[in-house]
Amino acid sequence: MSTTQSERLRELLEPLVGSQGLDLEGIEVESVGRKRVLRVVVDSDEGADLDAIADVSRALSAKLDETDAMGEGEYTLEVGTPGAERALTEHRHYVRAVDRLVRFQLTEGDELVARILTVDDAGLDLEVPGVKGRKATTRRLAFEDIAKARVQVEFNRKDKKDMTEEEEA
């Protein structure tokens, strides 16, 4: 997909996605033989449920058909969310990941796995899990020190409600 087509699609679709209360996170056109697939990734601070995705999918489909932005050939439109282990690339992604465990690749080359506690314009306050029975520690991390960041899936984490109930018992 040329940059021009990508920019045109983003300009066309972003206001429509925004009007549905969602953020346009990504657009990808993939061609395999004669088949083309347009993948649109959406999200919001509250997450996007299936009804919201279906609504935005119908709106995008109508707009694309109306404008012929994908050209004459057939294509498949896929609309979805970023997934559980999403890469964090925008400030809003970090805000959405508060209380989540994240793997950071630092610009100095080190790797860090920590939970995001708070986010501000300059960086993050993190809780670094303790090693070998030690208590967790807090750490400040500036955005400029982050090369890459990706949310980690946790299968057995207690949520805040469970932790509060244990503390009260």
Curated annotation (Swiss-Prot):
SUPFAM superfamilies: YhbC-like, N-terminal domain. This is Ribosome maturation factor RimP. The gene is rimP. InterPro entries: Ribosome_maturation_RimP, RimP_C, RimP_N, RimP_N_sf. Keywords: Cytoplasm, Ribosome biogenesis. Signal peptide: none annotated. Belongs to the RimP family. It comes from the Bacteria. One of its GO terms (biological process) is ribosomal small subunit assembly. One of its GO terms (cellular component) is cytosol. It comes from Streptomyces avermitilis (strain ATCC 31267 / DSM 46492 / JCM 5070 / NBRC 14893 / NCIMB 12804 / NRRL 8165 / MA-4680).
